[in-house]
């Protein structure tokens, strides 16, 4: 029988933390915040239940850490995607392609992201704690749209904030759809329609 780990040595502390975050995200996504237990997470991570507290003092802290980890993964990928393109519409297209790639690599990723809002609504302490994490979505989209506006790539009459809200709604809607629709070809077809719609609504020629 493999002995589960207790207090970690410095050398494997980061690996253990990664395992805890992985198992916690799986549990939060499939079982929900209320039904997730340290015992379940520790069993999957190969450590004792008590060892989790060396990394995360509470379940709230653990959930926030998972959210921060997921946000970093998503927006680091978005940042890398848009830097490979020059125009706003090319970058917009790349966001959908990246979301599809992330979904292929990690099918449960979108489920956790979508579920965060619901969990925060039901748990005031969680909602308060999540505010400690800098929201990268608004910063990312604001910079993307402000840059496009300054280069004349958005309709002159379209405020930057409106463009940000449109992108947030479209990307959020696509994320929610990807949770219920597991057919990747269907999702790619929807992404293609969104891309075409953006050319009609967000290009200067549409003004």
Enumerate the language-model features and the residues they cover.
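N-terminal intrinsically disordered/low-complexity leader segments
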Residues: 1-15, 22, 180, 206-207
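Short alpha-helical scaffolding segments that buttress acidic/His motifs in well-ordered protein cores
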Residues: 62, 96-99, 113-117, 167, ...
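Short, solvent-exposed amphipathic helices
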Residues: 69, 80, 129-136, 140-143
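Helix-turn-helix
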Residues: 15, 19, 23-61, 65
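Hydrophobic alpha-helical connector segments
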Residues: 65, 79-109, 160-167, 191
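Short, basic, alpha-helical segments at the C-terminal edge of helix-turn-helix-like DNA-binding modules
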Residues: 38, 68-74
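Hydrophobic/aromatic-rich alpha-helical bundle segments in the mid-to-C-terminal region
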Residues: 127-131, 135, 149-197, 205-207
């Amino acid at each position: 029988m493999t002995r589960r780990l207790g207090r970690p040595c410095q050398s494997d502390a980061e690996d253990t933390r990664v395992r805890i975050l992985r198992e916690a995200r799986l549990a939060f996504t499939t079982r929900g915040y209320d039904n997730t237990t340290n015992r379940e997470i520790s069993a999957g991570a190969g450590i004792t239940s008590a060892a989790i507290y060396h990394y995360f003092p509470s379940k709230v802290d653990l959930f926030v850490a998972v959210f921060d980890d997921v946000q970093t993964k998503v927006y680091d990928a978005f940042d890398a995607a848009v830097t490979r393109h020059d125009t706003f519409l090319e970058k917009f297209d790349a966001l959908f392609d990246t979301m599809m790639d992330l979904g292929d690599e990690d099918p449960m990723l979108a489920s956790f992201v979508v579920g965060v809002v619901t969990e925060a609504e039901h748990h005031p302490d969680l909602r308060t704690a999540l505010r400690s994490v800098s929201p990268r979505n608004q910063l990312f989209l604001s910079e993307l749209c402000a840059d496009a506006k300054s280069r004349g790539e958005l309709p002159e009459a379209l405020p930057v904030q409106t463009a940000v809200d449109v992108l947030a709604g479209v990307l959020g809607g696509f994320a929610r759809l990807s949770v219920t629709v597991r057919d990747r070809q269907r999702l790619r077809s929807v992404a293609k329609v969104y891309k075409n719609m953006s050319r009609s609504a967000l290009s200067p020629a549409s003004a």
